[in-house]
Amino acid sequence: MMKVLVVVALLVTLISYSSSEGIDDLEADELLSLMANEQTRKECIPKHHECTSSKHGCCRGNFFKYKCQCTTVVTQDGEQTERCFCGTPPHHKAAELVVGFGKKIFG
């Protein structure tokens, strides 16, 4: 039963990974920015670094591309500004955990 559960979790992770690849490749904003720049992105924004000015410039992690996650920050003056950083979304973290667990079990 445990082997079946691990295999099903691995299949779900692989499907999630492949669908994430397809979605990332087809994002309209990213395609427009690539056409505007007319150059491949060799420099990307690492995990935990600010991506406020380039929301589609995050690097790839082990399995997935990091996503630019934004939050509203209120300064002491009461001014609201948006701050963004590259990070791993929770569902990607869960998929990486399942894959890591599978690697430990099956070597």
Swiss-Prot record:
- Enumerate the PROSITE patterns for this protein: SPIDER_CSTX (PS60029)
InterPro entries according to UniProt:
Spider_toxin_CSTX_knottin, Spider_toxin_CSTX_Knottin_CS
The UniProt keywords, alphabetically, are: Disulfide bond, Knottin, Secreted, Signal, Toxin
User: Chief localization class?
Assistant: secreted
The pro-peptide lies at: 21-41
- List, in alphabetical order, the Gene Ontology terms for molecular function in this entry: toxin activity
Renumbered to this chain, the signal peptide range is: 1-20
Pfam families, per the entry: Toxin_35 (PF10530)
Give the subcellular location: Secreted
- Is Cell inner membrane set as a keyword in this record? no
Q: Which cysteines are joined by disulfide bonds?
A: C44-C59, C51-C68, C58-C86, C70-C84
Task: Write out the GO cellular component annotations.
Answer: extracellular region
List the expressing tissues: Expressed by the venom gland.
Domain characteristics, as noted in the entry: The presence of a 'disulfide through disulfide knot' structurally defines this protein as a knottin.
Q: Which family does it belong to?
A: Belongs to the neurotoxin 19 (CSTX) family. 04 (U1-Lctx) subfamily.
Q: What is this protein called?
A: U1-lycotoxin-Ls1u
Species the sequence originates in: Lycosa singoriensis (Wolf spider)
